[in-house]
């Protein structure tokens, strides 16, 4: 098993050798696919949609790898692409199904309940339903902080929001989830 070294991989991506570039990107795919899939899946819920969006994310990353400046970590850049792809997908889905923002919670909860790949118990289902009632930004912040254990600084880079605003968003999300779990 080869160890993942981001500095070496970035050097290989910048090389003139297409085989070296391809090998480096294959390592990126191998290292980040599962993490990106989980982030996307938390946003779109559907296994099939998450797989499609993961592929779109990786294709977009490959096609634009020369635009990666190295200001942030590669993972941050990939997460940003994945989040943007997911938000675009959700907005298109909402428009295609003629779903208002207010009705979106019900739509997503119905989707979660009918998901054949969901293997959690009743408490996990209740937690997921609570998360689905959050506004999109709070949902993103909560998932990245709680499930992915990302530092606020990295979330800030991905979402383009200040650390203070993210902390407030996470706090509000946690309170809303707590209220949902205690009253439902």
Predicted feature residues:
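Internal acidic/polar
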Residues: 2-9, 96-120
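Sigma70-family region 2
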Residues: 45, 58-73
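Structural recognition of an alpha-helix C-terminal capping motif at a helix-to-coil junction
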Residues: 52-59, 72-84
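Arg/Lys-rich amphipathic alpha helix in sigma70-family domain 2
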Residues: 67-69, 80-101, 172
